[in-house]
Regions:
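Bacterial N-terminal signal peptides that target proteins for export
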Residues: 1-14
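Bacterial N-terminal signal peptides
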Residues: 11-23
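Short S/T/G/P-rich N-terminal loop/turn motif that feeds into the first structured element of a domain
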Residues: 27-299
Length: 299
């Protein structure tokens, strides 16, 4: 658990988790060699009770095969929830919003791929209770350091809704965290994104919204984060912690944190990811038998 997030668990007033090493993590369509994408698009599938696990993997395998057969340059990776509602996230990264538009057009204009995706979506829809998407923009000024997708297995995602008229307080709070962590835990990394389109999560109020994700190789990093937070508190001292609590109370309307795990079987990663971690990414998608496919289609 990242230090910012941990404050939520301890019931403190300070509600600002900040950690996200998206670097090549979300560079599926990003041409940058390093660093997070400028635009992050996430599609969320909320599953009906009992419709997750291998059943959902089999359904998603149709999408993976469709993109592979088309030799499409569209790439994404999947995350399965380990907390909160049962859901899967499908994550795509772009250099800009124009590239997002081009990627959508490439699918629509490929009649064979478009038909295969439509068919897969129809079958997959029987497993879903709802579906939505959100598009976000990178905020480098609220981010710290860079990480790597290599070895990453978990995503800790935190959403913040900022009170109207208090964006400056939120920015100040984020910078205070960054300045302190540079001193006590210089290996700390995070990337922050601001929501441009869509709601961050069902039930969240509207307003300026920021999404922060901590990528982890293992959950042992949660334990390390707790130790780092003790150093962080000592660095700030009583007056610094009080100032942070004031800024938190002034700027944050609501926040929530959830944990997700990468699912390579439902992912369509770029080749460079596979080359670096073939044992993890190069796994066959869960196949759907003809009997299962017919059963799903007829539900």
């Amino acid at each position: 658990m990242h230090p910012f997030t941990r404050k939520l668990s301890f019931g403190c007033a300070m509600l600002l988790p900040f950690a996200f090493s998206l670097s090549p993590v979300l560079n599926a369509q990003n041409t940058q060699d390093d660093g997070p994408p400028n635009v992050l698009v996430t599609q969320r599938e909320y599953l009906k009770p009992g419709k997750g696990g291998m059943l959902h993997e089999r359904s998603e395998s149709a999408f993976v095969r469709a993109f592979a057969n088309a030799k499409s340059n569209s790439h994404y990776f999947a995350l399965d929830s380990l907390s909160g509602p049962t859901r899967s996230l499908f994550v795509m990264g772009y250099n800009n919003f124009a590239d997002w538009e081009k990627d959508r057009a490439s699918i629509i204009n490929d009649k064979v791929l478009n038909a295969a995706v439509d068919h897969a979506a129809e079958m997959d829809g029987d497993l879903l209770s709802s579906y939505d998407s959100v598009a976000m923009m990178l905020r480098p000024d609220l981010s710290l350091n860079k990480g790597s997708i290599n070895g990453t297995r978990y995503f800790e995602i935190t959403t913040f809704v900022v009170k109207p008229g208090h964006r400056h307080d939120f920015d100040q709070l984020a910078h205070m965290y960054a300045d302190a962590y540079k001193k006590v835990a210089p290996d700390t990394h995070w990337d922050c994104f601001e929501v441009m389109y869509g709601n961050p999560a069902p039930g969240f109020p509207s307003g300026a919204t920021f999404v922060v994700i901590n990528t982890m190789k293992s959950q042992a990093e949660t334990d390390k984060g707790m130790a780092d937070f003790e150093k962080f508190s000592k660095e700030l001292g009583t007056s610094g912690m009080e100032k942070m609590e004031e800024l938190t109370a002034a700027s944050i309307e609501t926040t929530g944190t959830n944990l997700f795990q990468i699912n390579p079987r439902m992912s369509n990663p770029p080749q460079e990811w596979i080359d670096k971690e073939p044992a993890f990414w190069k796994v066959p998608p869960t196949s759907m038998t003809k009997e299962t496919a017919l059963k799903t289609a007829n539900q």
